[in-house]
């Protein structure tokens, strides 16, 4: 059974919400009796609203990918600090598998609950994951399209505010910061920027390594070896642009070494709606269901 439910304004057709996909199925409201054990669900409710629904689904035997942030952070104290709520189900926080196949593929396959990464963490972590455990300090400068701000209209995402402008926001206060730090195991300096495009995200990561500088060839080989078995991460030779991955589930990463100071710079691009949200959720659902990982994503 395929149900598509909405927390706000149900009883519309999907084609009226996203006409580009030509899907005429109607949005409904969630009814627990409509789900069966063994079903799969992807939950994209707002932060703090997703946790009760996810708990009900998991308790009924449904395997869930949670696209909200409600199960990403392992430290329970982080939820009131960064998201403004006390988590109602610490047991599910402890059980949830972080939904990054490039690191947790085998655990995702057997999970009851997968926490889909946030868009900024997805790009940042993929950019730095081959160096995890070797990073002394890192600065991440990230730029995202307007769709990353969600559907709720605010002054900052009006056309007249965004067009022909680039601006930083939530400096030293963005709630994706602890998620990046959790997965990389190092404190990060993270600054996000809003850019006047619909979809796409570029994270430029400047890292100093604990074991000293690497040669450019050694760095590229490190990345090529690490991502050789991961179908949606492409290691490229020149800094990629957002256009290369828009409307896809791919990430492109380009690692380079500063020949003067030895610092590693990694450019990482994703589609914030694709690999940064819905595409990643489908990739995780495929793994959980024992389907080909790239089914529906090529």
Question: How should each PLM-predicted stretch be described?
Answer:
Residues 130-134, 208, 284-291:
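Active-site catalytic microenvironments for nucleophilic, acid-base chemistry
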């Amino acid at each position: 059974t395929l149900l598509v439910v909405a927390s706000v304004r149900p009883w519309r057709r999907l084609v009226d919400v996203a006409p580009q996909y030509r899907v005429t199925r109607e949005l409904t409201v969630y009814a627990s009796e409509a789900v069966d054990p063994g079903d799969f669900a992807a939950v994209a409710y707002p932060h703090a609203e997703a946790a009760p629904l996810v708990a009900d689904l998991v308790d009924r035997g449904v395997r869930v990918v949670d696209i909200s942030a409600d199960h990403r952070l392992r430290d329970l104290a982080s939820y009131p600090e960064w998201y403004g709520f006390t988590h109602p189900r610490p047991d599910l926080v402890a059980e949830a598998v972080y939904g990054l196949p490039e690191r947790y593929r085998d655990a995702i396959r057997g999970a009851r609950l997968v926490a889909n990464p946030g868009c900024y963490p997805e790009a940042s972590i993929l950019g730095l994951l081959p160096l995890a455990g070797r990073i002394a300090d890192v600065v991440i400068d990230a730029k995202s399209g307007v769709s990353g701000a969600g559907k709720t209209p605010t002054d900052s995402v009006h056309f007249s505010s965004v067009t022909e402008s680039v601006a930083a926001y939530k400096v030293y206060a963005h709630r994706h910061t602890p998620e990046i730090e959790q997965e990389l195991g190092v404190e990060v300096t993270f600054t996000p920027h809003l850019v006047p495009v619909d979809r796409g995200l570029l994270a430029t990561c400047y890292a100093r390594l604990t074991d000293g500088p690497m040669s450019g060839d050694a760095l590229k080989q490190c990345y090529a070896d690490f991502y050789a078995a991961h179908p949606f991460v492409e290691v490229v030779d020149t800094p990629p642009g957002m256009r290369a991955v828009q409307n896809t589930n791919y990430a492109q990463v380009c690692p380079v070494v500063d020949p003067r100071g030895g610092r590693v710079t990694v450019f990482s691009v994703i589609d914030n709606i694709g690999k940064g949200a819905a595409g990643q959720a489908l990739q995780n659902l495929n793994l959980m269901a024992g389907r080909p990982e790239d089914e529906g994503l090529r």
